[in-house]
């Protein structure tokens, strides 16, 4: 679109984590940021020098979460090392940040509200008393609502619409989001494969009891509103053919399909009972270790204009 070639550098997570070891609790604009700038700018300056460029810069200069003085200090030092100029205009002065917001909204661009560092994000979400759901990554690789993967999917669709000349509008929706932190079931002190459906919750992180009632294909535990279904029932409702629950755990269908399964099992959109899929229904006492999060959230939705 701009005619500028994008050169992607190595996403060197391991070495970055080693470099900032001991600085995990540093605040935004602190020593950890300085270490990060030095590493990033050295790679950028080196590449600019290789390409024969006379100057380099950084999009971090537009971020209200970063120190302009700190950025300029790091950039100038690396520029001197490679004998090139670090361009550091103050994009924020004269209401520059507000202008950025206006333009981003006008052009329907995604605007990230954190710097991208997992330590900075964690502290920011703690201050906001919000779940850092950007750091959740299901072992099933399922794309969950308002996850980074969901945003990538949305904006890829946006590019498709742009290429096809389809008119669209990106709007925001407030909704109830959910994330599973961990979950497993024990029978006779042995962990059995188990899969928890979306919007499953448990009052505490631990429950134990026995399944004492079956109505149709739904099996009820005698405590904490917990319910079980067999893999056979799951396959029937999802129109899938998983051979084992373990296979299901590592390769779940889409979040939307699992929501439909839940709604078929319990015809109540407000129900937050824990619903667990197992290979076979346990006949002896069992233990459940489970933690999930239910929280208000906002997501972007793309609407086709006809």
Regions found by a protein language model. Name each.
Residues 122-277:
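Long, charge-rich C-terminal accessory regions
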Residues 6, 44, 75, 86, ...:
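Generic structural hydrophobic/aromatic packing signal, biased to beta-strands
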Residues 38-42, 66-82, 114-131, 150-165:
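Short flexible/disordered coil segments
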Residues 1-60, 64-75, 81-89:
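ATP-dependent adenylation/nucleotidyltransferase module used to activate substrates
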Residues 68-106, 121-124, 132-146:
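C-terminal cap of thioredoxin/glutaredoxin-like
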Residues 19, 37-41, 72, 94-104, ...:
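Charged, low-complexity, helix-prone segments enriched in Lys/Glu/Asp/Gln
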Residues 270-306:
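Long mid-to-C-terminal assembly/interaction modules of large eukaryotic proteins
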Residues 26-34, 104-120:
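A polyampholytic, Gly/Pro-enriched intrinsically disordered region
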